[in-house]
Amino acid sequence: MDHSDVYEPYTFSGKHHVRMYDFSKLTPMWNKDASTPPRKFADMHIASTVAMELYNIERELLNMGHLSGMETMMVDVRKSPEMIPSTINMRDHITRLVNKMKPICRFDERLYSLCGELVHLRIELREVPLDTWLLSKKLNLKYEVVDNIRRYRAHIEMDMLRFYGSIHPWLKRLGLQSALKYEEYLVELEDGKKESLCQFFVRLAAAAATEASMKKPFMTTLTTGVANWRTTFTTFFLALANQLFVPSTPCMLFLGREGTSTASCYLMDPRTNNTQDTLKAITEDVVPHLLARGGIGISLQHLNGKFGLMHVMKVLDSLVMAANVNESRPTGICVYLEPWHADIMSALNMRGMVAAEESRRCDNVFLALWSCDLLFKRYLRHVNGEKNVIWTLFDSRASILTKLHSEEFEKEYERLESEGLGVASIPIRDMMFAIIKSAASTGSPFILFKDACNRHYITNTQGDAIAGSNLCTEIIQKTDANTNGVCSLASINLARCVRNIDGNRQFDFDALRYAVRLATVFVNAIMEGSDVPTEKSHSGRERNRSMGIGVQGFHTAFLSMGLDLCDERARSLNKLIFEFMLLEAMTVSCEFCERGLPPFADFSNSYYARGRLHFDGWANVELAAVEEWNMLRDRIVSAGLYNAQFIALMPTAASAQVTEVSEGFSPLFSNMFSKVTSTGELLRPNIQLMEELRTIYLDNENQRLATIAALESANWNIQTALGNKPECHSLLKYKTAFDYDQALLIDLCSDRAPFVDQSQSMTLFITETADGTLLASRVMNLLLHAYKAGLKTGMYYCKIRKATNAGVFCGDGELTCSSCVL
């Protein structure tokens, strides 16, 4: 998809270098000569408008040869207005049409786009007028949001007109999965009606503008001109509708609505050491957050006695299963344990095919190892030939270890070991065997490096170390028995930062910085207005005001510039992107304080107050913006930072579907992703690949179809299907995550790590050998590579592609893994 005409260059002006944008050039107003007029949202003549659009699409499908033998409506309402079908009949017809067309999308990317447009027509048939939407009890908008929408209605309707003029037609043709995902996010209203896509963006922008207007520095950082509710609304509305940045799923579902939480991540460390207190903590803290649809990471390291941990795991497993029944946003729990926990071997065998017994099976709870460096140091001693290297497990008598990290941890561990306080000793090879076997068989445990997380934190944590991360392993926050970690997320759509400049596709850093600036203000605004389930979470949010700004479309952006992820130009660009993301986010946060807002609570005790920034903890970091960093460093010492944390690279599996770009910072999972679910087939073709293929065979449709057939036979592996075709040489860049050398992908994570002050949800993608086996050493070597690179997250999921077919085991229990040679 060509997005290059959406954003114009940004200019730099004002004391704080605000990136201004002339929004009158962002999207053109409605073209009166267009075949379909903009939505008349005042009187909602929906049926006739949709019938006309449906007629045009069916004509287009007929011309493409895709309607042969299929039922059509083909009603030209301009000639026969009395023949307009009912909205119910049109919706049913659209559903049948999409279901029949979906399989053919594998061969024609234009059809994939048209199917998306059909789904948007189905959405439009359920729209309601703006007043009806505002008063919906099922939507339950906050009073102050409703009040502002009414007060500034004339201004909002001008932005809505702009949306229907050019943004909406572009969104409607993004693709089928985008349309289906938007349909899922739009709020269900009374009488079978639904929030419209335009109302969806109005809700998000109005809610954020309402909160931003309560703290003037939020608004003034967006403009050097007049800063008020209207200009703030328009800024957010146009950026959101144009997908420059994308809010988190909880935000899209709940922002602006009463009694909801928009935070994505909650981190807990109850520090309970018996079953009774742990169950109390679950009841009082875990359950409310599950019901608020938040993802939870919880450390149970202190629950380290006899007959406790696995029974509590079973309780959590049942809670997750019950909480996710019939929910639009399923959630989950990840339990964090250190590898010296007395019950660690039982925990490693609680999921999937490795579950020792049904009574201890916990398929709805994830496990993460909060691993000390010492575990890997001992394994390296074994690899280097040392005999009888062991790993010792401890019970609660060694609880002091949870408070320590790095050298202090190692000294205390070895002291306890020498005094004979261990409850079991395991050969280090067997310990690693158990970890890798569980990962290869179930997708987890996730693996994070405790020492790296603590070393690079904003305060000195020695003596009270950080105990865990979140559900998806990208959030690193200090928690305790009285304070939960909380993080609100948004992702920058990097594909929207690629532009045609002098005939070449280039990355626009002004667009990137503008997107980060908007996302920083947006996330801070929604944090102000969001409810949190418990006082502990309220305390954590207020103490740190931690943000998690990530990315999506990383691979899509690089492909659109013709770059392989691992060539030198790509590696250089990778570092620059994340350096400027951190720079802009911290600049905005500092500006908040310069304009009168207080720094986060622990600022005076943080390294920031002494002028130390995150990348200062890394060796040999080369900065592109040395002068700007030096100035910002001085400003931070002088004024402070409003937020404690900024960049977190989360998975964007759901939100990247609305943008039709690659997930997070990972390579594309497949060039033709297909997954059968309980609601039907989820299909996502690589549109860039299919469009380029059409260009190559522009005058030879038979050859194009033959090439696609070859790709189908090769499970859409480019090298296998097209490696010998000289005309397809340019397509070899379309490698998938499984085609890349995983060590090189880890190197990309390492290159950007100095600028990621939280962490990265780094998944490993591994293919079995031809005989259907998987060597444990392959996984282990990658973990060692991540450890030596100094990463905080060593492995999120371990995804295994079967050698015999396209089946991929993703750790969700839907497919079984192949056998492993360990």
UniProtKB/Swiss-Prot annotation:
This enzyme's EC code(s): 1.17.4.1
Signal peptide region: none
Residues with site note (Important for hydrogen atom transfer): 265, 487
S-S bonds: 265-487
Superkingdom of this protein's organism: Viruses
Swiss-Prot/TrEMBL site (Interacts with thioredoxin/glutaredoxin) positions: 817, 820
Gene3D superfamilies: 3.20.70.20
Protein transport is among the record's keywords: no
Site residues (Important for electron transfer), renumbered to this chain: 796-797
GO biological process, one term: DNA replication
Catalysed conversion reaction: a 2'-deoxyribonucleoside 5'-diphosphate + [thioredoxin]-disulfide + H2O = a ribonucleoside 5'-diphosphate + [thioredoxin]-dithiol
Keywords, alphabetical: ATP-binding, Disulfide bond, DNA replication, Early protein, Nucleotide-binding, Oxidoreductase
Protein family according to the UniProt entry: Belongs to the ribonucleoside diphosphate reductase large chain family.
Function: Ribonucleoside-diphosphate reductase holoenzyme provides the precursors necessary for viral DNA synthesis. Allows virus growth in non-dividing cells, as well as reactivation from latency in infected hosts. Catalyzes the biosynthesis of deoxyribonucleotides from the corresponding ribonucleotides.
Subunit details: Heterotetramer composed of a homodimer of the large subunit (R1) and a homodimer of the small subunit (R2). Larger multisubunit protein complex are also active, composed of (R1)n(R2)n.
Name of the protein in question: Ribonucleoside-diphosphate reductase large subunit
